[in-house]
Amino acid sequence: MAVWQAASGKVYLPPSTPVARVQSTDEYVQRTNIYYHAYSDRLLTVGHPYFNIYDIQGTKIKVPKVSGNQHRVFRLKLPDPNRFALADMSVYNPDKERLVWGCRGIEIGRGQPLGVGSVGHPLFNKLGDTENPNSYKGNSTDDRQNVSFDPKQLQMFIIGCAPCLGEHWDRALPCADDVPNPGSCPPIELKNTAIQDGDMADIGYGNLNFKALQENRADVSLDIVNETCKYPDFLKMQNDVYGDSCFFYARREQCYARHFFVRGGKTGDDIPAGQIDEGSMKNAFYIPPVNNQAQNNLGNSMYFPTVSGSLVSSDAQLFNRPFWLQRAQGHNNGICWFNQLFVTVVDNTRNTNFSISVHSENTDVSKIQNYDSQKFQEYLRHVEEYEISLILQLCKVPLTAEVLAQINAMNSNILEEWQLGFVPAPDNPIHDTYRYINSAATRCPDKNPPKEREDPYKDLNFWNVDLSERLSLELDQYSLGRKFLFQAGLQQATVNGTKTVSSKLSTRGVKRKRKQ
């Protein structure tokens, strides 16, 4: 960025050398009047709401973890528009242009009824209630209780052509000359990582690596006690120079403190009031009680609330409604580079957990004589239901020197995917072909086959949704397509066999003046 800096502390001077300016995609991408509708199947997933269930060996997952407090990250794979056999070949010149997709609208459909979920821990670190205490309670060896609560209410989705960037606090390495004492609090740092499918969202206890920073395994609920809660780094994505991770987003969060508790255990940071003799902090925070009082055994000061998401209502839903993209927050105005789109979703307003009970002896219900709770196996399951619809606009990128330089500086892999300047070598008229190439009598096959371009996100976990054969030009045949045509005042027409969209023009006549 070109910024002015103070030379001697008094005068601000302009940048000494010109700095390359990042262009918006609107400056070099040409949009056509051809629109496609893309839609997914009904996307379903079922699992346990708190943890993975493994087999006896503990190596294979029998039932995956599926929680309403997880991020769902859909990686939508779109077809390559440059391979489309367009009926109207005047749309673009393949020798001078390349086709890309532009996202103009999206609707994230959610099934299942609204419901409030409950999370908790059978051994939760809760010493006592500090909102309305009736006696002074001190610490013991184990004060854990069976506590449950409803999480913070969260609805959010983020649209981009790159994975959403998340942030969380994690354990940091201490300085080399600073040897920490046993039991001392470790330093922490803010880390940025991509949000993957299945990563836990913040449910009211912050974006923290609980697995590394809460060794008692009792300070939070079961669904996050061994996890890392992430939160989208909106500040960093909004200031991204290209804006690929977040075209736009919608967010709705709400919570309130329902109960106020205090932690059990030994306080690591003592209240500064215990100096010997007449220290500078003596009686600064509290005055010591007499020896025969229960208050003489000072209680903990590790206070915390249990949050609640409160009312769940259909009046404040972000889903099952269309969103239109006119202007993105960054320089990328909805262009889907590499023919893919990332949709990051969190919605815990449909957070009902199913309780399933099975008789341990598989006895018919009509033959059970007396109720015995120990003869029933109780199970928990959570289900998620999604459906995604898109409005895609066909766009052209001119292959000029200025545009190619801009794209190469942004991501050179885009040009490699377009195969610019690729001229195949002349074919040798005679090749050697072995019949039994894998036998011991012939030479080994080629050990260095041509490498395909590696997926930069191969190590990340996403819900892959293939839309390569789910596109249609018949916008008026789909719900989102009809909404798009109506809200924009457009109508469809067929030009040279290709469906195009044009504006509706008013043909209202001019009112004649009345003769005097």
From Swiss-Prot:
The identity of this protein, by name, is Major capsid protein L1
* GO CC annotations, alphabetized: host cell nucleus; T=7 icosahedral viral capsid
- UniProt-listed SUPFAM superfamilies: Group I dsDNA viruses
Subunit field text? Self-assembles into homopentamers. The capsid has an icosahedral symmetry and consists of 72 capsomers, with each capsomer being a pentamer of L1. Interacts with the minor capsid protein L2; this interaction is necessary for viral genome encapsidation. Interacts with protein E2; this interaction enhances E2-dependent replication and transcription activation.
Q: Which GO terms describe its biological process?
A: endocytosis involved in viral entry into host cell; virion attachment to host cell
Which Gene3D superfamilies does the entry link to?
A: Major capsid L1 (late) superfamily, Papillomavirus
Q: Where is the signal peptide?
A: none
Chain ranges passing through the membrane? none
Q: Which GO terms describe its molecular function?
A: structural molecule activity
Localization terms from the record: Virion; Host nucleus
Q: Which UniProt keywords apply?
A: Capsid protein, Disulfide bond, Host nucleus, Host-virus interaction, Late protein, T=7 icosahedral capsid protein, Viral attachment to host cell, Viral penetration into host cytoplasm, Virion, Virus endocytosis by host, Virus entry into host cell
Q: Which family does it belong to?
A: Belongs to the papillomaviridae L1 protein family.
The UniProt function text for this chain reads: Forms an icosahedral capsid with a T=7 symmetry and a 50 nm diameter. The capsid is composed of 72 pentamers linked to each other by disulfide bonds and associated with L2 proteins. Binds to heparan sulfate proteoglycans on cell surface of basal layer keratinocytes to provide initial virion attachment. This binding mediates a conformational change in the virus capsid that facilitates efficient infection. The virion enters the host cell via endocytosis. During virus trafficking, L1 protein dissociates from the viral DNA and the genomic DNA is released to the host nucleus.
A Pfam family hit: Late_protein_L1
Please give the InterPro entries that the UniProt record associates with this protein: Capsid_L1_Papillomavir (IPR002210), Capsid_L1_sf_Papillomavir (IPR036973), dsDNA_vir_gr_I_capsid (IPR011222)
